[in-house]
Amino acid sequence: MPYTFGIIGDEDSIKSTTFRKNLREKAEGKQLKNGAFLSANAQNRLKRGQALAVALAIERERMLETKLSDDEYQLSFDIDATILAFNFSEKAIVSSHPIKLTLLTSLSEKPTENDRSKLANIMFFGDREKEWFQDLSGSYLITEFMKAVQDTEIRQAWRSHIRV
């Protein structure tokens, strides 16, 4: 995942730190379907049954260039990710929900590496200058992750029973 790792993979980089900060700010205080609230700052208290942690796991990326005509190219950046809920009391993943994101733009010239990097950066940080996307001032990935987390039922525990 060259673009993802190059942008947010180095934990000590400014971009990675900024991305995590933006994610924490968006998550703070959001209510889930089960009535619980997300907190990026408060620590869970296991004795009170606060054992869940929610994570975003990016599994795959794909940058695709398509020639539509002599003077039009399509550039798309896809990310496959999973929302994971981990129960610390049970030491188990209790929920896993896939999400797929695609950013798509049209260019009048063959896309350059700079264009590809720019589209990947928009996925993680948005297009504040509104050069390519008028309505995407913040991170597309964070926005869609938060929508999915809030629309997904996350249980405290998951029980599987197999009958033979």
Predicted features by range, described:
Residues M1-A57, V164:
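N-terminal segment of the mature soluble domain
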Residues E25, G29-Q31, D70-Y73, A92:
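Domain-level marker for long, solvent-exposed, non-transmembrane regions
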Residues Y3-F5, F19, F37, L52, ...:
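Phenylalanine-focused residue identity feature
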Residues E90-V164:
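C-terminal/domain-edge helix-coil "capping" segments
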Residues S16, R20, S76, T112-E113:
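Solvent-exposed, acidic/flexible segments
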Residues N44-E90:
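Surface-exposed short loop/turn segments
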